[in-house]
Amino acid sequence: EATGLKMHEVRVEVRRMGGAFGGKESQGNALAIACAIAAKATKKTCKMRYDRDDDIIITGKRHDFRIDYDVGFNEDGKILGIKFKHYVRCGWSQDLSLPVADRAMLHSDNAYNLEDVSITSHRLKTNTQSNTAFRGFGGPQGIIGIERAIEHIASHLNLDPIEVRTINFYRSGTLLKGNLQKPQTTPYGMPVVDSISTEITETLLKTANYKSRLEAIKAWNKDNS
């Protein structure tokens, strides 16, 4: 579009690609357009490369999120309802922000059964770099939101966060007819039929000597506070 040429009239040669394809999917567009305009104007091949300082200033990074939540829970730490609001700093262009923000929403439950949940996502256009794909692609941001809520509940009730996590874990179900254990479902309606979060957590607590180490830490803190 920048050159007024048809797609089949443009030839692009790339020496090597390497990895991290998500971040390269659209972040090179600005350079590509500049090269195309220069090549058409001079009728010569054109090659451009950012130096490292310009690269860091211009190219997008991981999407930073602000996640607000309101959560209701009982005295055991069981989540009765939760409402998330995601505020996503996308930058000056859309890039891959929509699927990144979507995936954060889809990971908002992490390993927990949220029976009554609302998730709202606000994708913010800002005067900063256009953020892009990064390892996890929005998943870690969504997970951090619910984990922060779990820690908040545990602190409020003076419970071990492990207890709050365990009581809220998905339990395994089955899709077989006649089985009384109906699968729980994710906020987007997917049946959970193979969750082993409780079992693996119990194994880890035993093999890590969690309780004895926790008591030792409490005793040390008491004696040295």
Which functions belong to the PLM regions below?
Residues 1-225:
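Structural alpha/beta core scaffold segments of enzyme domains
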